[in-house]
């Protein structure tokens, strides 16, 4: 299983009303994994361009493959990117692919954020994960969202910039 990049893109499309129902990677019903081979393999093998408008600003999301067998897709996407969102699977922590992607972003001096996904799994320890991120990537790691609850008690997050908490339905 991947970190959830395609699922994140699908959720953004759903929240912004571009689609009426969220697709599912395992069912082959997502917007960005439309290639027959991607549907068969149940993971991304090509980069998909997903344009989304937010507050009169057009954001072009490039949903890239997570497996580094397809590193060429990631490198090509970074050539046209102004910034990046690294999606991290909270259940797996910092993986080799995360470190390689970070290195590519460092080489290109691209700004980035890390989106921590799968926080709702029962065995996630946010404090341990944050420590691991800081050990791997140093002072560039600064959380701007902190979870409300951990493990089975995860309910939402607090945005530390505006000090607003959001609890999931």
Where are the model-predicted features located?
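P-loop NTPase switch module centered on the Walker A-proximal segment
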Residues: 1-88, 94, 143
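P-loop NTPase catalytic nucleotide-binding module
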Residues: 1-3, 21-22, 90-169
């Amino acid at each position: 299983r991947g970190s959830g990049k395609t699922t994140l893109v699908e959720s953004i499309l759903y929240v912004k009303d571009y689609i009426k129902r969220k697709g599912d990677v395992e069912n082959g019903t997502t917007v960005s994994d439309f290639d027959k081979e991607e549907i068969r393999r149940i993971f991304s093998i090509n980069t998909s361009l997903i344009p989304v408008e937010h507050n009169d600003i057009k954001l072009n999301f490039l949903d890239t493959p997570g497996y580094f067998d397809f590193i060429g897709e990631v490198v090509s996407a970074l050539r046209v990117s102004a910034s990046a969102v690294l999606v991290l699977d909270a259940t797996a922590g910092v993986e080799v692919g995360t470190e390689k992607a970070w290195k590519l972003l460092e080489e290109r001096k691209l700004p980035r954020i890390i989106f921590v996904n799968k926080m709702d799994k029962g065995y996630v320890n946010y404090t341990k994960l944050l420590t691991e991120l800081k050990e791997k990537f140093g002072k560039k790691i600064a959380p701007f969202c902190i979870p409300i609850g951990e493990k089975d008690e995860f309910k939402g997050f607090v945005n530390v910039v505006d000090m607003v908490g959001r609890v999931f339905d």
